[in-house]
């Protein structure tokens, strides 16, 4: 008999699901924030989609999340803001208004969007 390669016969199927959880938080500024200053918004100063008060800003899942900040409906650049998850007095959003730019005016809407992904995979192996 001639030499032949002996190998395993295996079939595998992997199903991966990624479920996003998108949460939006809203705030309307009460005073002007000058260029070069920082606007700090505490968790309790935000309200949710249904108008209820926020008590806690969610944790960003490591490598499976991001947040966006909109001021007056305009998406802001990365690096302008700092997000800190947590309850009232701990959780906050800091927006550093660039020096030499325009201020954030009073009554400006600020929207914080937090997206966390929950991935899951199942593998079926048949031999």
Residue ranges and their predicted role:
Residues 2-71, 75, 114-126:
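Extended beta-strand solenoid/passenger and fiber regions
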Residues 3, 84-127:
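Surface-exposed interaction regions enriched in Ser/Thr/Asp/Glu
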Residues 77-85:
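A short acidic/small-residue loop/turn micro-motif
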């Amino acid at each position: 008999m001639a030499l032949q390669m002996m190998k395993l016969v295996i079939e595998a199927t992997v199903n991966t699901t990624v479920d996003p959880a998108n949460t939006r938080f809203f705030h309307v500024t009460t005073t002007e924030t000058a260029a070069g200053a920082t606007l700090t918004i505490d968790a309790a100063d935000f309200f949710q989609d249904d108008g209820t008060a926020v008590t806690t800003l969610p944790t960003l899942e490591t490598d499976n999340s991001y947040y966006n900040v909109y001021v007056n409906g305009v998406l802001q650049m990365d690096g302008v803001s700092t997000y800190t998850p947590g309850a009232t007095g701990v959780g906050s959003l800091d927006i550093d208004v660039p020096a030499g730019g325009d201020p954030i005016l009073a009554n400006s809407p600020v929207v914080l969007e937090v997206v966390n992904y929950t991935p899951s995979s199942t593998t079926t192996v048949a031999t």
